[in-house]
Amino acid sequence: MNGIPMEHGLLLAAVLFCIGLCGLLIRRNLLFILMSIEIMMNASALAFVVAGSRWAQADGQIMYILVISLAAAEASIGLALLLLLYRRYHTLNVDTVSEMRG
């Protein structure tokens, strides 16, 4: 018998995804937007692992490794762009940066 039911794992993944989506829609700071995207990616990775463990397949863990590697690449590129924006505009507010387009 498996320790955690599949429904509980998928419910946790859905809650985490909704938290990330709310953070993406509500927050105006680019750093928090990047963190919200990371939460959403980890929630989708958790759903893959839970579904893979339900049917005793390694596919979920393979997809988890793919999602984590994509999240690491996205985080490094996102943080580099964030640093560039902060050096140029001295703010991380989305509204301020979008008003400064020239």
From Swiss-Prot:
One cellular component (GO) term of this entry: NADH dehydrogenase complex
EC number, UniProt record: 7.1.1.-
Key word Cell membrane present: yes
Keyword Manganese attached: no
The species this protein was found in: Aeromonas hydrophila subsp. hydrophila (strain ATCC 7966 / DSM 30187 / BCRC 13018 / CCUG 14551 / JCM 1027 / KCTC 2358 / NCIMB 9240 / NCTC 8049)
Subunit and interaction comment: NDH-1 is composed of 14 different subunits. Subunits NuoA, H, J, K, L, M, N constitute the membrane sector of the complex.
Protein family per UniProt: Belongs to the complex I subunit 4L family.
Gene, per the UniProt record: nuoK
Membrane topology: Multi-pass membrane protein
MF annotations from Gene Ontology: NADH:ubiquinone reductase (non-electrogenic) activity; quinone binding
Protein name: NADH-quinone oxidoreductase subunit K
